[in-house]
Amino acid sequence: MPHWITHPSELTDRLQAARPARIGLDTEFIRERTYWPQLALVQMAIGEEILLIDPLIPGMNAALKEWLTATDIVKVMHSASEDLVTFKCACGVLPRPLFDTQIAAALAGVGGGMGYQKLVQEVTGTLLTKGETRSDWMRRPLSPSQLEYAADDVRYLFAIHDELTRRLTEQNRLGWLAEDAERLLATVEHDDGERWPHVSLRTAQFLEPAAQRRLLRLLRWRDLQARQSDRPRSWILDNEVASQLARFPPADLDALLQQFDKFPKAPRKLANAVWDALNTPLPDEEHAPLAQAATDGNKAVLKRLQDTVAQRSHELGLPDGLLASRRHLETLIEQRSWPAALGQWRRAVLEAQVMPLLEASEA
């Protein structure tokens, strides 16, 4: 039976008594009406015990903080990115060192992007249910079925950790995992908004450079507003409205309001702020990369790079897309230098194969 922890001192006492070398971690949170996730439950495995920790209790997150940052305790988590953001918001810290079982499974050749249930079945043979996936985790008390579902989310992490550690050790890939886990942590730790968000929108490639800069202004403003007001980005300004305003900039505020009339979700109450954002140049916008459709030549180079990466992945027993995504390769073509996002171990296993192809395309 899992232990329901409602006093910070109880959490501290249990962890001090156990002094574990590893803890299994998961969270339940809600993010339907906010920009930032709201922590609703923390599940923690310690040895044979499972603690279900109520973060709504005053002082609980402060008690958690000490153990999340203990460098002598490995934090075993599955697909941790959203949980990391949640811990950062609630506790102000990130759990380190991190062993992400989803990343580890991919690096070990077990499978790419594996869900927790599938990985549990693969390693332990246990079939988990999905009964409480859409549950209300903020309500109290939690139901017995919620408690059992939550406990299952960490119950099998150590068995998976042991098996994947064994495989990665045999394959000499534990260093790969450490690098990827630290990159994930750094991404969350230093997230202050995407610098060039317009490049990620498919519609941007059809806009003229001046329109792309206007789109960049709107998206940067939207992200700042979403963070400050703790509301989803789409509630501030959705992509369709932003793209239309960038493509067809209104001549004045009245014209802006007329354009808003065409879109039910347009933020009429924020019209003045939208107008200012649209018409206020950013200090760095002249340096912004432009989204553009690939040329025939670049398409051919991209195809050769993708084929080479796929072959290398097959040789290493890695799932497709793990070594380098399409976007990584597009960045490589644009920059003509190794993308920082691909890191060191990928460079070691890929650079000798892909860089000659890139150099040949320039000849």
UniProtKB/Swiss-Prot annotation:
A Gene Ontology BP annotation from the UniProt entry: tRNA 3'-end processing
Leading EC class: hydrolase
Pfam families: DNA_pol_A_exo1, HRDC
EC assignment: 3.1.13.5
Transmembrane segments: none
Catalyzed reactions per annotation: Exonucleolytic cleavage that removes extra residues from the 3'-terminus of tRNA to produce 5'-mononucleotides
Function: Exonuclease involved in the 3' processing of various precursor tRNAs. Initiates hydrolysis at the 3'-terminus of an RNA molecule and releases 5'-mononucleotides.
Domain of life: Bacteria
UniProt xrefs under CDD domains: RNaseD_exo
Protein name in the entry: Ribonuclease D
Gene assigned in the entry: rnd
Family stated for the protein in its record: Belongs to the RNase D family.
Record domain 3'-5' exonuclease: where: 5-168
Alphabetized InterPro entries for the sequence: 3'-5'_exonuclease_dom, HRDC-like_sf, HRDC_dom, HRDC_dom_sf, RNase_D, RNase_D-like, RNaseH-like_sf, RNaseH_sf
Record keyword Signal present: no
Cofactor section: a divalent metal cation
Compartments in which it is found: Cytoplasm
GO cellular component: a single term: cytoplasm
GO molecular function, one term: ribonuclease D activity
Location of the HRDC domain: 208-288
Protein keywords: Cytoplasm, Exonuclease, Hydrolase, Nuclease, tRNA processing
Alphabetical list of SMART domains matching this protein: 35EXOc
